[in-house]
């Protein structure tokens, strides 16, 4: 995985709860990845969705409050299902999973109020995700989690997003996220680009920061926004800030199966717990935002 993207430098998980632990990150050496797409890696156009009109159609994106561990971003992909990044579910200090009941999804949170509030009753990560992986790029692979809410969200104004096929290099994508210093309302960045891609990760020109982890990456097809990827980390390529995202199309089936397996285990007499892989403390380093 170390040479997945040549030229990738100083990877940093983008969970807001990690902001206080920022420190210089190691470089991942590799040949130059210069090119016409990377020359435009720092797209602009971040727009804050501060009003009901601004947010119309995006309220299924929400703030995921992680108990006392900060927040991430999540997206509703079913009445009772929220998609986010797997690393959001771990305490950054201990490496121990956060109990599902400590997590709250605040759909469409804006200026102190959410369209809907739901506690999480169950959380699963992708079966191949390893929080404790020593190689930072390995931590991006399969960095996906599926959360089951305590009750479905059924509101005419808040419809779950569809999911879609993985975008390819050169495709335009949108990202809706919360982040450090803009946690009171979501922001949208439209028409950033897929700069490079592999089966397990994408490099995007989108702007992300702590708190953006788990944010949905959208492709707009026939006027419909489809979630195609999830933000995992921020990084640098040849000195340019980029975002790393996890493709969704292939891993989603495994995530759904992990959730069903967790439910089945509970019915057999086990407790309702999150099914988390690799729960030991990580040695990952973080760069300053």
Give short role names for the model-derived ranges:
Residues 57-104:
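Catalytic histidine site
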Residues 141-144, 149-208, 212, 249:
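Chymotrypsin/trypsin-fold serine protease catalytic domain
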Residues 75-76, 207-231:
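Catalytic nucleophile loop of clan PA
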Residues 85-88, 228-237:
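Short beta->alpha transition motifs characteristic of CBS
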Residues 42-56, 90, 96-153:
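Conserved catalytic-core segment of clan PA serine endopeptidases
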Residues 2-77, 257, 261-289:
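Protease-domain processing segments flanking chymotrypsin-fold serine proteases, especially trypsin-like
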Residues 65, 106, 218-221:
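Core beta-strand residues in small-molecule sensory/regulatory alpha/beta domains
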């Amino acid at each position: 995985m170390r040479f997945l993207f040549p030229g990738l430098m100083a990877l940093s998980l983008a969970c807001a709860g990690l902001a206080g632990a920022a420190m210089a990150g190691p470089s991942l050496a590799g040949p130059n990845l210069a090119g016409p797409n990377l020359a435009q890696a720092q797209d602009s156009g971040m727009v804050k969705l501060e009003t009901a009109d601004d947010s119309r159609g995006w309220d299924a994106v929400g703030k995921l409050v992680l108990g006392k561990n900060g927040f991430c971003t999540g997206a509703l992909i079913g009445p009772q299902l929220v998609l986010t990044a797997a690393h959001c579910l771990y305490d950054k200090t201990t490496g121990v999973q956060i109990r599902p009941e400590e997590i709250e999804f605040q759909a469409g949170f804006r200026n102190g109020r959410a369209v809907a509030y739901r506690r999480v009753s169950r959380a699963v990560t992708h079966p191949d995700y390893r929080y404790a992986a020593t190689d930072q790029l390995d931590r991006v692979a399969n960095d996906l989690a599926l959360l089951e809410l305590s009750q479905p969200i059924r509101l005419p104004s808040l419809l779950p997003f569809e999911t879609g096929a993985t975008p390819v290099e050169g495709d335009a994508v949108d990202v809706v996220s919360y982040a450090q210093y803009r946690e009171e309302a979501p922001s949208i960045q439209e028409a950033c680009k897929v700069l490079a891609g592999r089966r397990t990760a994408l490099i995007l020109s989108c702007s992300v920061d702590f708190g953006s982890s788990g944010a949905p990456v959208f492709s707009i097809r026939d006027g419909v926004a489809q979630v195609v990827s999830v933000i995992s980390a921020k990084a640098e390529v040849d000195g340019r800030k980029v975002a790393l995202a996890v493709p969704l199309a292939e891993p989603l089936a495994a995530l759904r199966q992990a959730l069903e397996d967790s439910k089945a285990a509970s019915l057999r007499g086990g407790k309702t717990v999150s099914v988390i892989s690799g729960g030991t403390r990580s040695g990952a380093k973080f760069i300053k935002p």
